[in-house]
Amino acid sequence: MRKWRIEDSSELYNVPGWGLKYFSINEKGHMQVTPCDGCAAVDLKEVMDELRLRDVTSPILLRFPDILDNRIEKISKCFKKAAQEYEYKGQNFVVYPIKVNQMRQVVEEIVSHGNKYNIGLEAGSKPELHAVLATNAHEKSLIICNGYKDEDYIELALLAQKMGRRVILVVEKLNELKLIAEVSKRLKIEPNIGIRIKLSSSGSGKWEESGGDVSKFGLNSSELLDALAFLERNKLTNCLQLIHFHIGSQITKIRRIKNALREAMQFYVQLSKIGFKIDFVDIGGGLGVDYDGTRSSSGENSMNYSIQEYVNDSVSALVDVCVKNNLPQPNIITESGRSLTAHHSVLIIDVLETTQLPIWSENMEIGENDHELAVELYNIWDKINSSRVFEDWHDALQIREEALELFSLGLLDLKTRAQIEKLFWSVARDVNELTRSMKHPPEELRKVARMLPEKYFCNFSLFQSLPDSWAIDQMFPIMPIARLDEKPNRLATLQDITCDSDGKISKFVSPQGASYGLPVHSLKNGEPYYIGVFLVGAYQEILGDMHNLFGDTNAVHISVDKDGFEIAQVIDGETVADVLDYVEYSPKKLVRNVEAWVTNSMKKGIITAEEGRQFLNNYRSGLYGYTYLERD
């Protein structure tokens, strides 16, 4: 058999499918990141080695701002190409909805690099609006105000408009329009108004219900007519500048996007014909990310189109309807936050330890005095073959069930239970091997593979760093970042360090779309084994929660040019004191309480003065240390 090659690892983890040109494996067998054309490739193992020397420990979120820049350029170039092809006469405005990732460094990078592309920002709440207004965006860039609004929200937006910012208040509910009219009249400011329209068309994938007739936001046709009548009565007709729709995030099928565009553009036609001058059509988000690399619409973690196809369909739909109806071509706004940010962040976690299922080794024997159930199961394992694998598996399941019942009744000793466990899992392994050789294995036998992966315990919290994996079964590309020139010899699920059985990942990207175990290597003594979780730049940081009080991880910004990489910034993860403060514990008071307890224990002679001093030192240092496990 030939030696394992890096090309084999690349295929095994489907890196070309999901990695685009950003992620690949180098000749050392290490994962590398190439943020842009002309940039040097960054060896992730070398990055981790350097961070380790700086005492920056995993879990670590690596951010590559140059990838953000590249995504902005890519989307903008796609629109430029489509405009030329379809003779589009309007402008395209890329607007970043900061809810996707509100981290200041991310927003500022998008605004800074996006200034030459007139990148705008979208706020969906009052706190987000405060952040957006204080961000130094280009004066020509748009600020789109979505979400529910109160009087303070509207007043803030209108006064920002008066001071020169291009702010558009998008009406989500009919009563917001009345409130906008009241506040604008009081402030004597003519508002820039948009209306979100509830389309019948819906998206596809996990967020399909975000669009369609039952969607949370938007005005239906009847409400839209009421809104238009209200604008006319209050002499605000000229204020309506934008119509907006959104049919859901991560749309998997391009056909759904086309249907929505066709429906939305008819609203533009109807409003134009009755005298409203609409300058902007905001087509919302939905541009997908190919998390599993299959370029398929059959699952929820991919999509069957490219950015260019998405843009072409958007531009051509708008141009076609305007030409047919002899109408001016409005500007297009896109809010593709997931596509902008997903690729720029990589989570690196290290494996702490492993456990595997017990097996019966070949040098073990069954004796005359062993329990009859153990003898029977041993004979099944000893003689199992493809001709009777179904029957053998059913018999093994029955014997195991009988043994567990007898043990619960006190009729089976611990030694026999252990024998049954080892033999059962040995049978399961053999059944799985025989099943893999079948051309059309039955579903029952295919499920055996899901029972067998080892457990790799990793230093992270699924709920903090990958909440979508837990909440909605989102798949992310996951793989070791080194030893990729070696053939993996283990299949594992990943377990986090929370005290929660849901804190695990048991579904992984593969060339076929999904696998119930991750191919990994055996651990080597004294050598860290790092696993990378890719495409985590959208939503994960901001949705993460503090289950078991595990806080934000360390974050590292890496700048790249043609000559190499630089660790531009290290942002320390949250300390124990930080997370305790969130739940109303005062670190200073905690220390005082512990000091009093230790002093009292020393007075009573329970501990020595040296033991008390050591305990207090450990307590204080731990209080201001990382919430995750730290190893020398």
Protein language model regions, located:
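Active-site-proximal beta-alpha core segment in soluble small-molecule metabolic enzymes
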Residues: 87-282, 287-293, 299, 304-309, ...
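Short alpha-helical segments and helix-capping/turn motifs at coil-helix boundaries
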Residues: 8, 73-81, 104-109, 129-130, ...
